[in-house]
From Swiss-Prot:
EC numbers on record: 2.5.1.151, 1.16.1.6
Classification lineage: Eukaryota, Metazoa, Chordata, Craniata, Vertebrata
Annotated compartments: Cytoplasm, Cytosol
Disulfide bonds: none
UniProt protein name: Cyanocobalamin reductase / alkylcobalamin dealkylase
GO molecular function, a single term: demethylase activity
């Protein structure tokens, strides 16, 4: 049985509030909206009206979830600490809020046996209304010709200072006709800005200038920047230097 948009919001309210306190945001959408813009090879294998939820992390996640997680939990040495924190936080909130629901969770880093990602994160961000996915197709006369340029999502309040973390699918929840799709905010409006965005993301991504393509209400703290600028293989040493990991967790 399909549920109304009001019931969707009621279902997600406590979950939304719990994750917000940890520095995450959620954006619900129908599986059919996602499948409609992709080839069959990338479809999510659920009925079109099935409720899905995209989870993103905001700058607050680092201080509100990640650092407390490091203080209270043992990090597995072979897994990325941020990924562990995200999985731990989502698992706890799902268990608390959806004890009687079947929720399938896919993380942004997970791959299928075919080596395709479990879901296309930026497409999900766009169809859910979380962030506009800017691609070469959004530019009338690309100055780089046939050169491959990857697209990037921009959040209307956070610019590029966020990350897509997970996709939840509520296997037995169908959203009704009243649950309408919301277009993402087109906050990079001019062709010149879009060109600058894609060039910054593809050619100068290390300087992070693409993240400031629009004014952001919040940005990563200096400590968070230092963590993400550090090469992945050296981040555990940095966490030990900060006092968050013991030698047995290295």
């Amino acid at each position: 049985m399909a549920i109304s948009s009001e019931r969707v919001e009621e279902l997600l309210r406590t979950f939304r509030e719990s994750l917000k306190a940890k520095g995450f945001e959620i954006y619900p959408f129908k599986v059919g909206w996602y499948n409609a813009v992709l080839t069959a090879a990338h479809h999510l294998q659920y009925p079109a009206d099935t409720l899905a939820v995209l989870v993103i992390s905001t700058p607050a996640m680092f201080e509100c979830a990640f650092l407390p997680f490091l203080q209270s939990q043992s990090c597995e040495s072979l897994r990325d600490p941020i990924d562990q924190c995200t999985a731990h936080t989502l698992s706890a909130c799902i268990s608390l809020c959806f004890a009687n629901q079947f929720v399938d969770v896919s993380y942004d880093y997970e791959m299928l046996p075919s080596r395709k990602p479990k879901f296309l994160a930026q497409t999900a961000a766009h169809v859910s209304g979380a962030a506009y996915y800017y691609q070469t197709s959004d530019i009338h006369n690309p100055p780089w010709g046939e050169k491959k340029m990857f697209g990037v999502c921009v959040h209307p309040q956070l610019g590029g200072w966020f990350a897509i973390r997970a996709l939840l699918v509520f296997r037995d929840v169908q959203a009704g006709a009243g649950f309408q799709q919301r277009d993402p905010a087109d906050c990079v409006c001019t062709q010149e800005e879009r060109i600058r965005l894609l060039e910054s993301f593809n050619l100068r991504w290390r300087d992070w200038s693409y993240r400031d393509i629009v004014p952001a209400e919040d940005r990563y703290s200096d400590q968070q920047k230092q963590y993400f600028i550090t090469p992945p293989g050296q981040r555990r040493a940095l966490l030990r230097q900060w006092g968050y990991l013991t030698d047995t967790q290295s």
